[in-house]
Amino acid sequence: VLMPKVTKMAVKNTPPSEFTALFIKVGRLQFLLISFIVSAFVAFGRQFIALWAGAGYEDAYYVALLVMIPVTVPLIQNTGLNILYAMNKHQFRSAVYLCIAVLNAGLTFWWVEEYGIIGAAMATCIAYVVGNILIINWYYYKKIGIDIPLFWKNILHMCPVMLVMGTVGWFILDALHI
């Protein structure tokens, strides 16, 4: 949906500040939607998995959280991918994703024996954080010119909404004795 607009901006050599404004505007909306889903899962996911899968699947909740939470960052920064494609600078991202896969596979192989499925999920979590959050955000900031500190300042101002939703869900569960 954003690709035509972003491509037009890239062709016109739009200044990075305008890309930043779009990145923040769309990212805030995506954060609201995704934080609602993640908050609902944090509040109700354990009970949902217990009802759906039954006994013996308690670790599935923690596995889901370890994978779901770091994936929220590239989801709320999806506009950046459109910007990379429009500027024809997506090769670096592809290389980072290859490194994420190698790191994930290596850590999973190393940790799954000792820590089981939680170790595998932790390996995925660490690989995502290093690649998708640290390295890709650095690339957006240093090489593309998107003001990532300003983006995170805007997102962090919205975090109380997510915390309130999670707290309300927790109180509902507590009141219902679930």
Where are these regions (language model features)?
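Short runs within selected transmembrane alpha-helices of multi-pass transporters and secretion channels
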Residues: S39, Y62-V112, I117-K142
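Interfacial segments at transmembrane-helix termini and the short loops linking adjacent helices
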Residues: F41-T72, I144, H177
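Hydrophobic alpha-helical transmembrane segments of multipass membrane transporters and ion channels
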Residues: R28-F36, I69, V73, P160-V168
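Helix-loop junctions and terminal segments of transmembrane helices
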Residues: V1-G27, L81-A86
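Transmembrane alpha-helical segments of multi-pass transport proteins
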Residues: I100, K153-I178
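Juxtamembrane/transmembrane-helix interface segments of polytopic membrane transporters
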Residues: G45-I49, T108, V112, A120, ...
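Membrane-water interface at loop-to-transmembrane-helix junctions
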Residues: F19-I34, E58-L66, L84-V96, I100, ...
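Transmembrane helical elements of multi-pass membrane transporters/channels
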Residues: V1-K8, L29-L32, L66, P70, ...
